[in-house]
UniProtKB/Swiss-Prot annotation:
Subunit structure: Homodimer.
Organism: Prochlorococcus marinus (strain MIT 9303)
Keyword RNA-binding set for record: no
Protein name, UniProt field: Pyridoxine/pyridoxamine 5'-phosphate oxidase
Gene Ontology annotations of biological process type: pyridoxine biosynthetic process
Stored HAMAP family: PdxH
Ligand binding (substrate): 14-17, 71, 128, 132, 136, 196-198
Gene expressing this chain: pdxH
Length: 222
């Protein structure tokens, strides 16, 4: 079959989801462990950018979204890194509640995570920064993220300047760069099904009889 016509009616483009199902009995009681299971399956399936997630923030007037990479997660939350002067970081400073979305299209799955984002410790940021390749560490110093620049030549000149400055290979962690941790208050796991009768399960925190936090799991209508 040839490539679709650029004039094709996009309303007619559809795919019938039938790869898998999701039942309540299949779910781990801990949403972080359920996420780990699905992420491992996404990695095993060799999906392109399986750790990519859409981060949505709010500046008080309008939302904005962008793709960032998950770099760590545990029961405390989900970590990504950015320039603290970026639009996303400024949004978070004023309105910390955000959402994350992992769209694993080839598995007909997605996971949405909601909760407040908070800065991680400098020690945690340093540990990750030190693990990055030289060029990636240098790039942090080159770009004033989200600022208007007149041309790409500005970046090339700044790169040359930073390359000379850190020619010995020792690139320090700048004060303006580091990580955020999204502390989850809600999860939704979505599995595509035939006829758009998709499986959706939501996790929300609750306390058990011993006042320990557990998670309530609810099936949602598609």
């Amino acid at each position: 079959m040839g490539a679709p016509s650029p004039d094709q009616d996009i309303a007619a483009i559809r795919r019938n989801y039938q790869r898998a199902s999701l039942r309540r009995v299949d779910l781990d009681a801990d949403p972080v462990e359920q996420f780990r299971r699905w992420l491992q399956q996404a990695i095993a399936a060799d999906l392109q950018e399986s750790t990519a997630m859409v981060l949505s923030t709010f500046d008080g007037k309008r939302p904005s979204s962008r793709t960032v990479l998950l770099k760590a997660f545990d029961k405390r939350g989900f970590v990504f890194f950015t320039n603290y002067g970026s639009r996303k970081a400024q949004d978070i400073s004023a309105h910390p509640n955000v959402s994350l979305l992992f769209p694993w299209y080839d598995l007909e799955r997605q996971v949405a995570i909601m909760g407040p984002a908070e800065r991680i410790s400098r020690a945690e940021s340093q540990a990750y920064f030190s693990s990055r390749p030289f060029g990636s560490r240098l790039g942090v110093w080159v770009s004033q993220q989200s600022q208007v620049i007149s041309s790409r030549q500005i970046l090339k000149m700044k790169w040359q300047e930073m390359n000379r400055r850190f020619a010995n290979g020792e690139v320090p962690l700048p004060e303006f760069w580091g990580g955020f941790r999204v502390v989850p208050t809600e999860f939704e796991f979505w599995q595509g099904r035939e006829n758009r009768l998709n499986d959706r399960f939501r996790y929300r925190p609750q306390q058990d009889s011993h006042h320990a936090q557990t998670w309530r799991i609810e099936r949602l209508a598609p």
